[in-house]
């Protein structure tokens, strides 16, 4: 690479020994060898990249020539590989089309099933009479109809107010607050440490 002979290496070694001394010479040699390795690696990478670029250019030129000749004068091996590639591409396309058809068929079936289920639920809800839905306990109005019949002079707002005051309905949703309202004297307070 540098075209250095054995005698020139010995001369460089003696000069390095005199200048650097025996302690620093091995470290300097290791450093120089590391630089040489790095330079050789870079040169090899550049050579490989140039070779790949040349191959790529040759391939592109051969493709252009083949396009100009319309693939009629290609060698039998190249025409055979081109036909194989076309067949494999057609096979892959047909497989994809078949898979697409199956998927669309399955999704159409599932959509039809869901629509049938929705229609059946709508029919079931239509057959259930609204009066029976209103009679369930959750759907009962808050207004007490018995109390409204006893006092017909009360307005609906007053009837609703009385219904809110009814503890039997109120206790169904909330626990009684009596236990929390009064403080328990069971815990004696220590007032001696307050200053």
Curated annotation (Swiss-Prot):
GO terms for biological process: protein transport by the Tat complex. The keyword Membrane applies. GO terms for molecular function: protein transmembrane transporter activity. The chain crosses the membrane at residues 1-21. It is found in: Cell inner membrane. It is a single-pass membrane protein. Keywords: Cell inner membrane, Cell membrane, Membrane, Protein transport, Translocation, Transmembrane, Transmembrane helix, Transport. GO terms for cellular component: TAT protein transport complex. Its main location: membrane. It comes from the Bacteria. Residues 166-195 are annotated as: Disordered. HAMAP family: TatB. Part of the twin-arginine translocation (Tat) system that transports large folded proteins containing a characteristic twin-arginine motif in their signal peptide across membranes. Together with TatC, TatB is part of a receptor directly interacting with Tat signal peptides. TatB may form an oligomeric binding site that transiently accommodates folded Tat precursor proteins before their translocation. PANTHER family: SEC-INDEPENDENT PROTEIN TRANSLOCASE PROTEIN TATA, CHLOROPLASTIC (PTHR33162:SF1). The Tat system comprises two distinct complexes: a TatABC complex, containing multiple copies of TatA, TatB and TatC subunits, and a separate TatA complex, containing only TatA subunits. Substrates initially bind to the TatABC complex, which probably triggers association of the separate TatA complex to form the active translocon. This is Sec-independent protein translocase protein TatB.
